[in-house]
Amino acid sequence: MAEETAERGENAYDWQSLMFLYNAAIKEVRTKLDIMNDEFQYIHQYNPIEYIKSRIKTPNSIAKKLSRHGLENTMENMVEHINDIAGVRIVCSFTSDIYRLAEMIGKQKEFTILYIKDYMKHPKESGYRSYHMLITVPIQTTNGINPTKVEIQIRTIAMAVSYTHLTLPTTSRV
């Protein structure tokens, strides 16, 4: 009984530590994006970023995704197989801004790009269009550097609106 309680306490601490890293990674990415947007305004008198949203996946959502992939709900599986626990969505006005922002993000020395999915050039069957980048961000803590994954999605306002319409349930009136 005491071992079980201690294990739950350890798991809670591990979970909190992991969420700390993901939150810190989102802060790092958002700070870089804000600076890039400010610099772009300074140089070109134009802001490519309309707005930025970020989120951490809920424990329930993570568990469901692991289950869909046939994986046991463990911290190791979560870190290894769920790439969008930390997510940042950038919404811009024009399609050209998407590629300009992706290029600027790719030039950030602190970010390591793990992969890119270009649903702009290759839309999903559902019509979904967006540009996804999975990066790692080095998070410096007192225990060292922790590379932490963040998924960045870049899309236009029009895509954000049309994706909402694609995913909302339809209701019919009789």
Question: What is each PLM-predicted segment?
Answer:
Residues 1-81:
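Charge-rich, low-complexity segments
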Residues 83-85, 128-130, 145-149:
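Short connector loops at helix/strand junctions that flank enzyme active sites
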Residues 86-92, 152:
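Short cationic amphipathic helices and targeting signals
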Residues 94-97:
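Helix N-cap motif at beta-to-alpha junctions
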Residues 99, 111-136:
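Beta-rich nucleic-acid/ligand-interaction surfaces
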Residues 101-106:
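Short amphipathic alpha-helices in soluble, non-transmembrane regions
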Residues 149-157:
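Active-site ExK catalytic segment of metal-dependent nucleases
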Residues 164-170:
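Conserved small/polar residues in nucleotide/adenosyl-binding loops
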